Amino acid sequence: MNENLFTSFITPVILGLPLVTLIVLFPSLLFPTSNRLVSNRFVTLQQWMLQLVSKQMMSIHNSKGQTWTLMLMSLILFIGSTNLLGLLPHSFTPTTQLSMNLGMAIPLWAGAVITGFRNKTKASLAHFLPQGTPTPLIPMLVIIETISLFIQPMALAVRLTANITAGHLLIHLIGGATLALMSISTTTALITFTILILLTILEFAVAMIQAYVFTLLVSLYLHDNT
């Protein structure tokens, strides 16, 4: 079967159902019943991680910013889960699609900016013109600050897309090289296979780091506007 570098981005199906959907739904069968939630180790670990991330991100926010805690925690769990699911064999990573990442970044950025203009109108407008700017530079700086404001959601989406896509392509290329070298040089194939294993472990870390970075930047945008 002929394949190219982007074959892995095609959503696989089993019996007409998307494989990722089956993977996501299956763990729900293993969840503990409600009367065991208190003593369940998995739930305790999950709550500890959420509290740790929440403390790191929300400590800089005031009372108005704290109301976004649940949304930001849901965001980091969603992005982290989709990134990790993409590392499973024959699965698809939704965050490799720029359209999806823009669909997340634009509403979150717009919500933060609108909140800022509604609650702190003068302070939000002051960001477009730094204090002490020479009069001849005022029009240029206003244009530059406006462009930098509107480019923020694009930077969020492109950063996530590029990092996740680059890792998947590297895994595909090194995996293909390993298969090709097995019939040529076993020693070289073992070296490339070791590199592949290390790269895969690195991708697990990147998947979580990118989820954290995306959510942290949204949190910082929110902090600037609350």
UniProtKB/Swiss-Prot annotation:
Reactions accelerated catalytically: H(+)(in) = H(+)(out)
Subcellular localization: Mitochondrion inner membrane
Alphabetical list of Gene3D superfamilies matching this protein: ATP synthase, F0 complex, subunit A (1.20.120.220)
GO biological process: proton motive force-driven ATP synthesis; proton motive force-driven mitochondrial ATP synthesis; proton transmembrane transport
Chain positions with N-formylmethionine modification: M1
GO MF annotations, alphabetized: proton channel activity; proton-transporting ATP synthase activity, rotational mechanism
Record's keyword terms, sorted: ATP synthesis, CF(0), Formylation, Hydrogen ion transport, Ion transport, Membrane, Mitochondrion, Mitochondrion inner membrane, Transmembrane, Transmembrane helix, Transport
Residues annotated as transmembrane: 9-29, 68-88, 97-117, 138-158, 164-184, 189-209
Pfam families in UniProt: ATP-synt_A
Topology in the lipid bilayer: Multi-pass membrane protein
The protein's assembly and partners: Component of the ATP synthase complex composed at least of ATP5F1A/subunit alpha, ATP5F1B/subunit beta, ATP5MC1/subunit c (homooctomer), MT-ATP6/subunit a, MT-ATP8/subunit 8, ATP5ME/subunit e, ATP5MF/subunit f, ATP5MG/subunit g, ATP5MK/subunit k, ATP5MJ/subunit j, ATP5F1C/subunit gamma, ATP5F1D/subunit delta, ATP5F1E/subunit epsilon, ATP5PF/subunit F6, ATP5PB/subunit b, ATP5PD/subunit d, ATP5PO/subunit OSCP.
Functional description taken from the UniProt entry: Subunit a, of the mitochondrial membrane ATP synthase complex (F(1)F(0) ATP synthase or Complex V) that produces ATP from ADP in the presence of a proton gradient across the membrane which is generated by electron transport complexes of the respiratory chain. ATP synthase complex consist of a soluble F(1) head domain - the catalytic core - and a membrane F(1) domain - the membrane proton channel. These two domains are linked by a central stalk rotating inside the F(1) region and a stationary peripheral stalk.
Membership in a protein family: Belongs to the ATPase A chain family.
Annotated protein name in UniProt: ATP synthase F(0) complex subunit a
Organism: Bos taurus
